[in-house]
Amino acid sequence: RGLGDVYKRQVQLESFGPARQTDGAYTIKAYDASVIRQPACGQVDLSYFSDAAFLGDSLTVGFSDYQINLSGALICGYTGVGPDAIVNRAAVKSPTRGQEVALDVLAAAQPKKLYILLGTNTLTTLGASDRFLAYYGQMLDELRQTLGEDCIIYVQSIPPVRPAAAEKKPGLASDVLRGVNEQLAQLAASKGCVYLDLWEALADGEGNLKEMIAAPDGVHLSAGNGYGAWVTYL
């Protein structure tokens, strides 16, 4: 009898979630991001995004600026925005629609899928993550209430940056982002959302943004290779 059989016999796992129980001699710890993240589920064509919305900061703005084909998905990208602005219903500027309140735009559209990417513009300094994560949790609650249970909410990990960019913005250093993303994964699971690990597509072996897909500033993505890699991953 293999160790796996003994394990299965002695430990009974409950329903899927971010935490696990203690049973017998085994302590089942909380899942980490590598387990929580959504695995590949087969390729879909771009029409999959026709009933989707994308909510985020300047990285999401790039979908509009570079006219990335997402089959008419609603792009709610706002430069410099963080989850606090969404929760507090701040007036934010869309490059295509002007001033608006993101929650109102999403409430009117009622997308079936929502892809969130926030953090790159708000985690540039060390010590900002606690406030960021607290607001992120509140934001997910607000979005669920606004969009209902039928909307699939995808929480995307904060992408890595190039080493030179991390030196200027220590809050975006690889080890810092790994820690924040780990907490984002746990938060997503606890709120019934799907966690997507963009590092699978965007990070090199050292945990930095791949040079070939980086914009000159080392933080944003290049129009062709960068956004192509992102969309292909999604």
Language model segments and positions:
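Short, small-residue-biased leader/transition segments that mark boundaries at the very start
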Residues: 2-7
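Non-catalytic propeptide/linker segments at domain boundaries
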Residues: 8-46
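Conserved SGNH/GDSL esterase-like catalytic core that processes O-acyl groups on lipids
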Residues: 42-134
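Alpha/beta-hydrolase-fold catalytic nucleophile elbow
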Residues: 117, 156-157
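Charged helix-capping and loop-helix junction motifs
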Residues: 129-139, 177-178
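Surface-exposed amphipathic alpha-helices with a cationic face
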Residues: 140-144
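Catalytic His-Asp segment of secreted/periplasmic serine-dependent ester chemistry enzymes
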Residues: 161-234
